[in-house]
């Protein structure tokens, strides 16, 4: 992917991109797997696309910021071909035929993260994200969700796969109360709500379809104790996701979690 960036206004940049990619998803469509009889299914996408991104940031840290704001707006257009191959080792009448589909779509997204100092020790952050994609469904439900937009506002959510927080159109909001224990220590809470406009559901044949508008709500929360260093940070956290049930996680991170940009942002 080739990108060209130019200054935009006083503290933003405009980025223009164009590229071609071949992406491959490997997966199973059921939780009951006999590895001696079944291999993974595979969906392959050959895609050409372009993008325009307007982005700016005055945050005081790459991660666990307490001051400033960040804003990003992106518009992207793609066209490409999807190929599907079943992993079934034995061919039966129920084995899917080789699949090929051409589709084009537009997607736009917006993110805003802002921090407001309420008192010398207390800061309140706010987060807003909106996403829209006109992309059609893939060959099956699992493939569709793997290519859908994902709501991942925290570092932990970026490295986990959670079907409940994926959709082709959604809105998400969040609040981040932060108490500054000292110059380097902070106690940080992050609480988010996620609403897919049309939730993607699975029918009895393993195909995707849209449910009724605004009939689903998910949430996630995380509390962390953060020690900021000049070269990174140390964070001990506990978090909870509304789906799947009883999804609690505890962990410790060292340094920064940095993620490369994706072909489809």
Language-model-derived ranges and their functions:
Residues 49-182, 186-192, 197:
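C-terminal outer-membrane beta-barrel translocator/porin domains of Gram-negative envelope proteins
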Residues 6-13, 126-134, 147, 207-211:
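Short, mixed-charge, low-aromatic patches
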Residues 30-40, 87-97, 153-158, 203-211:
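Flexible, solvent-exposed loop segments that connect beta-strands
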Residues 222-224, 228-232:
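Internal helix-turn-beta structural module
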Residues 1-64, 69, 146-155, 163-171, ...:
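Gram-negative/organellar outer-membrane beta-barrel architecture
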Residues 120, 205-206, 231:
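Intrinsic-disorder/low-complexity loop/linker signature
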């Amino acid at each position: 992917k080739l990108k060209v960036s130019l200054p935009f206004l006083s503290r933003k940049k405009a980025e223009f991109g164009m590229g071609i990619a071949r992406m491959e998803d490997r997966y199973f469509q059921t939780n009951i797997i006999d590895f001696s009889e079944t291999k993974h299914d595979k969906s392959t996408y050959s895609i050409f696309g372009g993008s325009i991104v307007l982005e700016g940031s005055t945050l005081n840290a790459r991660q666990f910021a307490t001051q400033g704001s960040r804003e990003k707006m992106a518009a992207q257009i793609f066209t490409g071909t999807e190929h599907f191959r079943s992993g079934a080792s034995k061919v039966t009448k129920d084995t899917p035929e080789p699949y090929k589909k051409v589709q084009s779509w537009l997607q736009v997204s917006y993110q805003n993260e802002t921090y407001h100092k309420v008192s010398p020790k207390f800061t309140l952050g706010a987060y807003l994200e909106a996403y829209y994609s006109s992309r059609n469904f893939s060959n099956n439900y699992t493939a569709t969700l793997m290519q859908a937009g994902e709501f991942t506002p925290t570092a932990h959510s970026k490295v986990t796969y959670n079907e409940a927080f994926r959709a082709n159109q959604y809105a998400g909001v969040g609040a981040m109360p932060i108490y500054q224990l000292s110059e380097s220590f902070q106690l940080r809470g992050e609480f988010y709500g996620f609403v897919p406009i049309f939730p993607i559901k699975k029918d009895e044949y393993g195909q995707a379809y849209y449910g009724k508008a605004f009939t689903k709500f998910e949430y996630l929360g995380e509390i962390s104790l953060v020690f900021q260093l000049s070269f990174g940070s140390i964070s001990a956290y506990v978090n909870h996701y509304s789906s799947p049930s009883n999804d609690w996680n505890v962990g410790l991170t060292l340094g920064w979690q940095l993620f490369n940009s994706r072909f489809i942002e």
